[in-house]
A protein has these predicted regions:
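Buried, small/hydrophobic-residue-enriched core segments of structured protein domains
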Residues: 1-34, 41-43, 79-80, 85-94, ...
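Short coil/turn segments at secondary-structure boundaries
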Residues: 72-73, 141-145, 159, 452-459
């Protein structure tokens, strides 16, 4: 959590330290390595994902320190030499880190984060890097799908009670805001990140009173400027809305106040909201908002709108905060190159599964934008030494079907990654969550509608430069011959 005194350095898998210990005791101690984080598949078979979690990764790297009790525990495992234990005792982070800014639209196989530094240190980042980026990117991506389904209607994140632990509630709400939610019910997220919080009452409030009318009346008297009543504790149409209207008339109207709205948390939302809207309008409360909740997701929201539901705002909980339709984001962290005697040596991982064959070497991901429309045309991954000029036509091609080629012109090429750390020193200014959310909206708006479809979206092109494609295939051929 923000400003937490809890030291998360030891959120590591054991093999990270056993490998680091092995490197420490070999002639590779000073080896400089390059690692990339990337993902292979968009959640929910979608067309794109949203990058999130970088701020928390930075917090982790800023506070990397092995406490005395950590050192004693590691010593007790009898796996590490005394010299390596001493190295950890005086650990000083000294890596370079590049990352795609939070809120940016991202696609499979392109490097989201690149780490350059001593192999021992770069290895140690794997677990926390993946935990942080995978979780928040998953939730931000799910939130964005839900927000788009709502077609401009506000979506509030209401999921803290159903999250997989307090950290998931706290950071999940942050990611949901990045993805486009207008607020959260989680107070700590609101406090720490400066985002809007929202909430009114639970069914227990109504049940505590002798009758629904008294519960509503008491609440309206306490909160006349933000009166939103939960009307489905007993019967929405027969008691909830009639009692709400009565309280609006008797409590708010004499004060010159207008109700904020009503909330419905059960039943056939489409049918009930149509009836509720008419009842409120007939009573003179056409400005009274109707908020609905109840295990919503992008598909239910889309269907409700299609069926003519009269909904002004949505409160989405469990299916957002847990991304229940897709359990994991699937990001991985792989070695891409090492430096020896000033020379960069690209590395590749080969698999029988073609999707798991990595892209070797030091790389730069670029995004090409159409100058006239501002829409994203394609992403291109080049070698670290290449540049894409916006002043001349550029040929892109499908890395798997190389005969599929296209020449693009009248475009602007932008690097996706920015440098975050220089030799262990933070050089990046962390933006506020509200600014990240604004950036996210601009990013999604830069995509063609075909890419944002829920079902069978158009596959956005992530291509390799000719030089990088040749490098990859030369390594594949070289290693296959050795086999």
């Amino acid at each position: 959590m923000k400003n937490s005194k809890l030291n998360l350095t030891m959120i590591m898998d054991l093999y990270e330290l056993t490998m680091a210990n092995g490197i420490f005791n070999s002639d590779m101690r000073d080896t400089v390595s390059y690692f990339d984080m990337f993902f292979r598949r968009v959640p929910d078979k979608g067309g794109y994902a949203i990058m999130a979690g970088l701020e928390q990764l930075i917090e982790y790297m800023e506070n990397l320190k092995f406490e005395p009790e950590d050192i004693e525990y590691l010593r007790s495992l009898n796996l590490f030499c005394d010299e390596f234990i001493d190295y950890l005792k005086d650990f000083k982070f000294c890596c370079d880190v590049w990352a795609v800014p939070e809120g940016t639209v991202i696609f499979p196989h392109e490097p989201i984060i690149t780490v350059r530094g001593p192999a021992m240190q770069a290895l140690m980042l794997e677990t926390m890097l993946l935990v942080t980026i995978n979780h928040q990117s998953l939730i931000a991506t799910k939130a964005n799908r839900i927000v788009r389904a709502a077609q401009g209607r506000p979506v509030m994140e209401f999921g803290a009670r159903r999250a997989h632990g307090n950290g998931a509630a706290y950071y999940g709400a942050r990611a949901a805001i990045i993805g486009g939610c207008t607020g959260t019910s989680c107070l700590l997220t609101g406090k720490d990140f400066g985002v809007k919080v929202s909430g009114t009452m639970a069914h227990s409030w109504v049940q505590l009173f002798d009758d629904e009318y008294t519960a509503f009346k008491t609440y309206a008297e306490k909160y006349p400027d933000s009166c939103l009543l939960l009307v489905d504790t007993y019967n929405v149409l027969k008691s909830g809305i009639p009692n709400a209207i009565k309280v609006f008339d008797e409590v708010l109207k004499p004060l010159g106040k207008r109700p904020l709205g009503i909330r419905i948390d059960s039943g056939d939302i489409t049918y009930i909201t149509k009836k509720a809207r008419k009842m409120l309008d007939d009573a003179g409360y056409s400005d009274c908002k109707i908020c609905v909740s109840n295990s919503l997701d992008e598909y239910l929201i889309r269907d409700m709108i299609f069926q003519g539901a009269k909904v002004d705002t949505y409160g989405v909980g469990e299916r957002l905060i847990t991304a229940s339709s897709e359990a994991v984001f699937g990001g991985v962290y792989k070695l891409s190159a090492v430096e020896k005697n000033g020379e960069i040596i690209p590395k590749i991982k080969i698999s029988e599964n073609a999707a798991k064959i990595t892209i070797p070497g030091v790389k730069i991901p670029w995004r090409l934008y159409d100058r006239e429309t501002g829409k994203a045309i394609a992403d291109v991954i080049t070698t670290g030494s290449e540049k894409i000029s916006s002043d001349e036509p550029y040929e892109i091609f499908d890395p798997n079907h190389t005969w599929k080629r296209k020449v693009v012109d009248n475009f602007v090429a932008k690097k996706l990654q920015v440098k975050i750390y220089e030799k262990g020193k933070l050089i990046y200014e962390i933006p506020k969550v509200k600014d990240i959310a604004k950036h996210c909206k601009e990013q999604v708006d830069s995509l063609w509608d075909e890419v944002t479809r829920f079902e069978n979206p158009h596959t956005y092109y992530v291509d390799l430069s000719e030089e990088l494609w040749n490098l990859r295939h030369s390594l594949l051929n070289k290693l296959r011959i050795k086999e």
